[in-house]
């Protein structure tokens, strides 16, 4: 379960590099701060989806790395996740978990939104996940539609899970 939660948390931090949109450049400061996880999908069924999530905090580190922190309520348990994304030579591309996961950070064409994308192993099989992040907790239909188009283009499941937001994690409640 911890591996699954780490994979979900890790993928919440990643954003895929879209073909027509420029990738996140050397300046990781633009993505630093508080982000709300709006939606997620994957290329296969994810067994334990979060019931609710707190805002994600992204923090720029030395050398262009990023630290991400988020708390998810899954099966009545609060899971605090902290992941360091290590910058690579490719703009917008990071690795985590000693290179076992690849993360792309891509701005959405919709203002104050990013699309998160992660590729890596989960329970012995490869999985690809995408997430929609926004600065505001309110859902943007335009950003959600862009996320759907992105997911379709990447061959991900078209069943988009919209996530409940919570400022704090309370086991047994949202």
UniProtKB/Swiss-Prot annotation:
Belongs to the calycin superfamily. Lipocalin family. Residues 1-18 form the signal peptide. SUPFAM superfamilies: Lipocalins. CDD domains: lipocalin_1_3_4_13-like. Tongue epithelial tissue. Glycans are attached at residue 80. GO terms for molecular function: small molecule binding. It is found in: Secreted. InterPro entries: Calycin (IPR012674), Lipocalin (IPR002345), Lipocln_cytosolic_FA-bd_dom (IPR000566), von_Ebner_gland (IPR002450). It comes from Canis lupus familiaris. The keyword GTP-binding does not apply. This is Major allergen Can f 1. Disulfide bonds join 78-169. Keywords: Allergen, Disulfide bond, Glycoprotein, Secreted, Signal, Transport.
